[in-house]
């Protein structure tokens, strides 16, 4: 048994709540649809109760949750239901435990191997796919990249494979350190990847590209540092389309120059006005 959490929600809110749990690092989420019209979600965000409480309070302030011992012995069964992710025709993300493609990739395609472990970032979530698409469009040889809320490191590692000179990941989850380093090593870019639990204030020089696939409250909380550190481009995701005006206002004077919407989730490319 593992220390987990239980959230009672509604059919109307279950998708949003689940997506936010995935973004917080859930690896497996069970759903129990009850006859009284409620939906019970069970998952685990780790054994640090103080950290879990702060994450829930910040990202899901309106939900009621309780501690509950849960059986995650079958958690890895989700791996049986994922497949290689086509980001673009030339960029694919392969779960590390899959040896062959469910769909053929072009012979010259870039294929990133990722094992997220207990972190967020396999490449299949709409926010990750949108971030990867925009990242692929702006990475130039020699670029420097900051991946805020890096999780598995899929965004920063992909940037390095695509030609970035150096990438730094930040996260508040200690598991991101080991997992992202392992993924960087698996893709041959460990020497150019650094990951830190330190706040953004410690970074002095801006990066060519900053990518932040995190939820709206955190984007707003970090907006000053995101603006400061984005030398050329800022990619933000983790917000539902049509509900991101407050995020963009917080990021002014940066302006949106491109937007991708996948399954209702918006990913934006911002830059400084000319």
Regions found by a protein language model. Name each.
Residues 138, 172-273:
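S-adenosylmethionine
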Residues 73-141:
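SAM-dependent Rossmann-like transferase core, predominantly class I methyltransferases
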Residues 26-28, 164, 231:
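A structural motif
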């Amino acid at each position: 048994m593992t220390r987990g959490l239980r959230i009672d929600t509604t059919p109307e809110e279950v998708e949003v709540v689940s997506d936010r749990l995935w973004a917080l690092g859930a690896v497996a989420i069970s759903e129990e649809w009850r006859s009284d019209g409620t939906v019970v979600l069970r998952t685990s965000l780790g054994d640090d109760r103080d950290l879990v409480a702060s994450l829930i309070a910040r990202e899901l302030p309106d939900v009621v949750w309780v501690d509950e011992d849960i059986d995650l012995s079958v958690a890895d069964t989700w791996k049986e239901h994922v497949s290689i992710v086509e980001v673009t025709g030339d960029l694919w993300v392969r779960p590390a435990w899959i040896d062959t493609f469910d769909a053929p990739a072009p012979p010259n395609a870039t294929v990133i191997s990722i094992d997220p472990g207990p972190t967020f970032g396999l490449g299949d979530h709409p926010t990750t796919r949108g971030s990867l698409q925009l990242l692929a469009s702006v990475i130039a040889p020699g670029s420097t990249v900051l991946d805020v809320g890096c999780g598995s490191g899929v965004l920063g590692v992909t940037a390095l494979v695509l030609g970035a000179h150096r990438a730094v990941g930040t996260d508040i989850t200690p598991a991101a350190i080991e997992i992202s380093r392992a993924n960087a090593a698996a893709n041959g870019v460990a020497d150019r990847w650094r990951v830190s639990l330190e706040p953004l204030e410690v970074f002095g020089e801006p990066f060519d590209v900053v990518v932040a696939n995190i939820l709206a409250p955190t984007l707003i909380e970090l907006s000053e540092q995101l603006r400061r550190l984005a030398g050329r481009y800022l990619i933000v995701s983790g917000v539902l389309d049509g509900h991101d005006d407050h995020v963009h206002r917080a990021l002014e004077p940066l302006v949106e120059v491109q937007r991708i919407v996948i399954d209702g989730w918006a990913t934006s490319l911002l830059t400084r006005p000319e």
